[in-house]
From Swiss-Prot:
GO terms for biological process: hydrogen peroxide catabolic process. Its cofactor is heme b; Ca(2+). Its EC number is 1.11.1.7. This is Peroxidase 6. The lineage of its organism: Eukaryota, Viridiplantae, Streptophyta, Embryophyta, Tracheophyta. It catalyses: 2 a phenolic donor + H2O2 = 2 a phenolic radical donor + 2 H2O. Keywords: Calcium, Heme, Hydrogen peroxide, Iron, Metal-binding, Oxidoreductase, Peroxidase, Secreted. The keyword Transcription does not apply. Binds 1 heme b (iron(II)-protoporphyrin IX) group per subunit. GO terms for cellular component: extracellular region. It comes from Capsicum annuum (Capsicum pepper). It is found in: Secreted. It comes from the Eukaryota.
Amino acid sequence: GYEVIDTIK
């Protein structure tokens, strides 16, 4: 998705 948003999800 974005930057850390992919990491959080």
